[in-house]
Design a protein with these regions (language model features):
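Bacterial N-terminal signal peptides that target proteins for export
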Residues: 1-7
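Residues at the start of alpha-helices and the adjacent loop-to-helix junctions
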Residues: 2, 12, 27-28
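Bacterial N-terminal signal peptides
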Residues: 7-15
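Sec/Tat signal peptide C-region and signal peptidase I cleavage site
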Residues: 17-19
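Acidic, metal/ion-coordinating pockets
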Residues: 21-211
Length: 211
């Protein structure tokens, strides 16, 4: 079993960035997880992100690109598109995003707008996850996804959770949600373990670099 060092690079709002802590382990034994957040339809910095992702993929064979929500609403060019959010979906497909979860502002135009965005993008190549919205939207998402890392015995699990405390209550008709407290996390992770083999200390070394 090959030990795998996992490095997390978090890029909030796609601001100017550089990796604060360059991994020192063998590239073949390193997993890079690049995480973006709160893109809000911002297209301007995607060339920078594309350059960063390209550089890491050139150096490391195992790179995952994920987003933690609030991604497709917040820019008039994206909001007013005939298919709301389509420009973002096209760019995220081109960059090779693996997983995206839903944020509170992804419901700013209501649940039907979110459903239309998801169901109207059949070409979406990334998995959209959420495990704590129900019942009206639950069929739109996968609650979690397990991604096997090629050439290793490791799979990485992503669980999507949304905090809707700041969402307009008028957009919440028919939706119930659970705050991601300790018990909720436990219930979801227990379900996840039924479908995959959990990481153990012998199969992975965690090394976190946040920027």
């Amino acid at each position: 079993m090959i030990p795998l060092r996992i490095v997390l690079a978090s890029l909030a709002c796609l601001c100017p960035f550089s990796l604060a802590q360059e991994p020192k382990s063998d590239p073949d034994k390193t997993l890079i997880i690049i995480s973006t957040s709160d893109i809000h339809g911002n297209l301007d910095n995607f060339p920078r992100l594309a350059t960063l992702v390209k550089q890491y993929r050139a150096k490391y064979p195992h790179v995952l690109l994920v987003d933690s929500g609030d991604y497709f609403i917040g820019n008039p060019y994206v909001d007013d598109c005939e298919k709301r959010g389509e420009p973002l979906t096209i760019l995220m497909n081109k960059l090779g995003y693996d997983v995206v979860t839903i944020g509170n502002h992804d419901l700013d135009y209501g649940q039907e707008a979110l459903r239309d965005h998801i169901e109207g993008m059949p070409s979406t190549k990334f998995v959209i996850t959420n495990a704590n919205l129900s019942p009206t939207l639950e069929n739109c998402f996968s609650p979690y996804v397990s991604i096997p890392i090629e050439g290793t015995s490791v799979s990485v699990g992503f669980i999507g959770l949304a905090d809707l405390q700041t969402t307009d209550v008028r957009k919440m008709a028919g939706i119930s949600w659970t705050l991601p407290d300790e018990e909720h996390y436990k219930g979801i992770t227990d379900r996840f373990r039924l479908t995959t083999t959990p990481l153990t200390s012998s199969s992975a070394i965690w090394d976190t670099a946040m920027i």
